[in-house]
Amino acid sequence: MKKIFSLLVLSLAAALHLGAQEIDHLNCFAVLAGKNATKDGSVMLAHNEDDSGEQMINIYNVPRNPAKGTGKYLWIEFPGMEVADAFLNEHGVAVASDGCNSKEDREDYTDGGVLYEVRTLIGQKARSARHAVKIAGELVEQKGYRGSGRTYVIADCNEGWVFAVVRGRHWVAQRIPDDCVMTIPNYYCIGEIDLSDTANFQGTPDIIDYAIERGWYNPEKDGKFLFKKVYSRHDMYNYDRNYIRHMSALNHLTGETYNTNPDTYPFAVKPNRLLEVKDMMQILRSHGENVEQKINHKKKPLHPACICTDVTINASVFQLRNWLPVEIGAMVWTTGASPCAEAFIPWYSGMTKSPEGFARFADPQEAIAKHMSDSKEKRKNYPDAAAWKFVDRWHSICEDWEGKIGKVQQSNSSFQQKLFNGQEKFEKSLRKYYNHKTMQITDTAKLQEALNNYTAEIYKEYFKMF
């Protein structure tokens, strides 16, 4: 009997450990700002991608493929990962995601369901953020979603949407008001829904009825329906790492102090200032310095309040502007590691060639074909990749955090400001390549060359700082 009891204890401990690991790795974070909430009038999507293990960043410029009906897109890729990649396509549609565990335990799939396919199809075919929601919704309803749950943050040069999907075939999406900004840790953030308001909501018609059927929601006892509370897995919805990061970001954006109850957090808020790219970067770099609930962690810079963590493998700020040709107006500022120790480098959607070291395959189609199959021993097989420069720099900083991080951040700050100052001048130099009235490109080859060279030269200068 004693032996059986011991085995039960060990089994329970193992289960709790695995559960903690699963929660521990859910660290992604996103911020989405409408065009009237930003200083320059752009829609902005900021995102931290957090994953453990050996990760290798690649950034491809994938050309159109008429045979497959796919458009041109910029692809931030992590080989072997189904939930890490981000996309920015030729229509200025950007997508990234955060894991959001749901209560759903029923598996309802056709042909194995979908997961990675949601983001790839958006990147390849979406003509707008609203169209992306339609594509994703139809795919989920047809095939079934095989992850526990996830929120896809989608934006174009005019608007932003949040697409929340649950295991199986249920989903709901909400448009962010143009004058607002919203943040997403690793739980659902959509609250009240109104599917009759098709300008601002989309979703499966039975999203409320299904919750009633499962016993998750009782209208008489529970009051108003809050999707985030009803469909979120309880431990994730009330997990301190989630609500503390949420509080921290909301404070950055509004200057107000929030409590620890996620029920009270609005879907979106009006910022206390018009936001700039640098504001989004500041949030992605945050270690929770602005919240009292910051909890000590085994490593000094890392704790449950961190938005930027030791496993942040990429941070991106998509700056999407509708008054420029999309090749120039849609761009992403991105890093190769934790943003607290990196500068964000600009990539334009009109680029056609990645700087040296950012594509492990010369042909993007080979990268697509081998995304899952060729994902082992990446450093051994691709030792010259630029990815390892970022990885090695991060490890070096962590070996002497107190001694190095201050100097690194100071030099990064100066370099970042130099890039901000140079952006306007560079984009003015591109005016000769398009018609100012129609916004049509008049010299595609020279524009592409200028965009390719611009980012490549920045990296050459940046890597000298490593």
Named regions from a protein language model:
Residues 6-15:
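Bacterial N-terminal signal peptides
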Residues 16-21:
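Sec/Tat signal peptide C-region and signal peptidase I cleavage site
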Residues 22-115, 135-268, 272:
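A contiguous strand-loop segment
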Residues 107-108, 117-126:
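Second-shell loop/turn segments in exported
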Residues 293-421:
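Substrate-recognition/cap regions that form aromatic- and gly/pro-loop-enriched pockets
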Residues 398-466:
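Histidine-centered catalytic/metal-binding microenvironments
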